[in-house]
Amino acid sequence: MVFMPYISLFTLVYITVLRILPMPWKELCTTTLIFSDPVLIGLMFMGAIILFEKSEKVMQALAVSPISIHAYILSKVISIGLISLLSGVLIALFSGMEHSYIHLAVGIMLGSALFTLVGISLSAFISTMNNFMLIMVPTLIISVAPISVYTMGYKSGVMLLHPSISLIELMSGNISVISLMAISIWCIAMYIFSCLSVKK
């Protein structure tokens, strides 16, 4: 994948930052940085990949090929998910913190799936990288801003309905039925929407 050097660079930068952080900051920052990794990979890089494929007429070829929309989208979700998982686990391993790696892995895969689907959906409606950036910035703000409020102590149960908060809780090892249901519903909804977006 053409973006692998950039993904590797992000991972290396994250690991370096975590290694030099004082211990009181490390626990919170580790989970936040691991969360941001699938967000950036899934949303930003997937958007760029889809735009490149559109410029190469891949979408038109897909329309007349035996490959289904579901197979196309799932291949993106799985490939980006595995890259995000590898990157996230490496960050966790080198952070010097203890983690529940099962919870972490599930959170990374679900987060990667969600934001990959968001990236596919957004890029289906635009044709240039500039337009994608205009849409991506407010999307990132909506996705990430509630985390700062949550980590500062405002931990209302209603906030668990926000996908990013649910993912942060899951990656931290704090499993709840509400957070699992919330992120599952968000992923299913975005999968349906991305299928409809690619078909249009």
Tell what function each PLM region has.
Residues 1-45, 134-147, 182-191:
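Hydrophobic alpha-helical transmembrane segments of multi-pass membrane transport/permease proteins
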Residues 1-2, 109-145:
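A structural motif at transmembrane helix-loop-helix junctions in multipass membrane proteins
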Residues 26-64, 69-91, 135-138:
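Hydrophobic alpha-helical transmembrane segments of multi-pass membrane transport proteins
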Residues 31, 39-44, 74-75, 99-106, ...:
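Short alpha-helical transmembrane interface motifs in multi-pass membrane proteins
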Residues 42-46, 90, 117-122, 163, ...:
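Hydrophobic/aromatic residues in alpha-helical transmembrane segments
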Residues 69, 77-127:
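Alpha-helical transmembrane segments and their short interhelical loops
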Residues 145-197:
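Terminal transmembrane helical anchor/hairpin motif
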